[in-house]
């Protein structure tokens, strides 16, 4: 393992599309929605053969920090940082780069979502090693994943024409595209050189900080003013300074403005961003009628349903394509094809000031 390679796992999201199980203090990334381990535990385990937990850093919030520390005893506690206020991904990544640059001038960092699933980890780690190697040479690097269908829920990375998946070398990125309409998604799929944006980034810490100084100077100045990580003044200074950072994603702040961005056009490593309960349904094994539910459930003339109701017997009769998620204080019943809208329920609860259900 290269001692200059570090991992930053972003774990501050609320996962509102996974209500009612996902709450402020038990968000999607710390839930076991797609297996026996939580999503963040699976992420750390997947990275560990390339980046050991001792060199992993986690950015989260005050609500989740203790839970993450409890779930990941292998990660040093002082490397699980809580943002004082949410400021999107650019300040969070900039903060980690600032700390890593101060600890290791040659630090190369990979930035990873905490809540994705990878079904082919060996293939994934091959991509990871290639990305870290390319980033060490000074590249800003993204990972694109070969699309398997015309997805409208992902952004796309446009590579040069003729790009083939699975190559280990870094390629120039021609352009980034926002989440498309279906017609454009079909065109991207047919073209063959448009890849899903995985949300994974790789760069030297000093290269990223230089880009922040160019494109986000206020945030760069705020971060540069912080005392050395580990000093007595660091926590208090961070609490005062971090709210002064711009609220902006790393994509808009740096990646889409940088003069040169490279990418790896990855093949299929079984990636899924697990963006909704329906995505969980697609991931888990089904019974003969297409249902995902506990073995004790009773399903009569019921097809293609997803049920998460732990500790209760569930009986389904004459229904299809439903999502049912039960918790002690809330019950969700939704059509599977409306799963992306579950976050609207959270907004409705916020308007009603039902903080007990958030």
Model-predicted segments: where are they?
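Residue-level signal for inorganic ion chemistry
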Residues: 40, 96, 115, 157, ...
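Conserved core of the sugar-phosphate nucleotidyltransferase
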Residues: 120-242, 262, 336
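Left-handed beta-helix
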Residues: 1-4, 205-358
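Generic secondary-structure signature for well-ordered alpha-helical cores
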Residues: 35, 45, 49-52, 73, ...
